[in-house]
Amino acid sequence: MADKRQRGMAPGALIGCCLLIAVLSVLGTGYFYMKEKYAGSAVAYSHEQLRALDEGSFEYKIASRFYTEEELKNIRSNTVEMDPVDAPDENAEHEKMRLEHVTGSTYEGWMLMVYDSDLLKVAVNPAMDSGAQAPSLVDYVRNNHAIAGINAGGFEDAGGTGNGGLAYGIVVHEGKLISGGRNEYQSVIGIDKEGKLICSGMTGQQALDWGIQEGVTFGPTLITNFHQVFKEGQGDVPYLNPRTAIGQRPDGTFLLLVLDGRGPSSFGAKYQDIVDVMFNYGAYMASNLDGGNSTAMIYNGEYVNNTVSMYGSRHLPTAFIVMEDK
């Protein structure tokens, strides 16, 4: 009877295959680790890690393979990047707005350009006098049949409930003083009868006398007549936080900005970051609005930014909304 022997892989070949698999596994794991660290979903973290590398290092050479030369240059120099979203048809006759994604060294966010100044209004808590819980941003947009919106002024929170029922300071809506006294002096962000953005200290009576049609209280004012009026250290909260701001170009275009924060993809921004972004978009006037947990933007019925709360915007006493029609 023939001797039947089971043929198998030689011990040396088996060891070689095992070593090859191990090496490929290590290389694959290393690749995905490096990609997630330097070009991963946590954008702000990845950019921060990349900027910390020595350009001559082996690790930098690997990390640089995940970007184009222009992208590397922008990240290393902290340049603000602007990417169009749903770019409009150049032949559109009635384009109302344009949304762009912006990124910086520690943040990412969104800039909404509103080309018709008459479309921007202030929405006010209808139960302001009672102090009852205010609507959220999505409620303001939906209830007013608006097409976009951002949070606006500050709110009183004496009880620590955060219900946004009472606005802080002066609020003007449709040319009427809704909140604040006629002799009360506050930092007001307002829109006058000509659709111009006014960012200045004023009393409630002055707001009416100057023709403010829509306005809220917050600050500080960051840019006036193309000049940066905010100086680092003067009232600035020196931490990275979610930010909301409003600005305007000389042609009347309103600039509505939200910058995310308190997350791995966006640590947050300082006032100087707002100034830099606004200047990049040609603002001649700009002011900071309420930020932190309040920072939110809705566009076409959806939140476009990552709010601090997983449930979306907090309850707000006021919001800037973009109407469908004048």
Language-model segment annotations:
Residues 2-180:
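Zymogen propeptides
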Residues 88, 155-235:
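Active-site-adjacent helix-turn-beta-strand microarchitecture at beta-sheet edges
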Residues 107-109, 143-145, 184-186, 217, ...:
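Extracytoplasmic
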Residues 109-113, 188, 221, 245, ...:
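Conserved hydrophobic/aromatic beta-strand scaffold that supports enzyme active sites
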Residues 113, 147-151, 190, 198, ...:
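Structural recognition of the beta-strand scaffold that forms the well-ordered cores
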Residues 114-118, 190-196, 225-226, 248-252, ...:
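Short acidic-glycine loop/turn motifs at beta-strand connectors
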Residues 126-131, 203-207, 259-263:
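Short, solvent-exposed aromatic-acidic interface loops
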Residues 160-182, 231-284, 289, 294-326:
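Conserved, well-ordered active-site substructure
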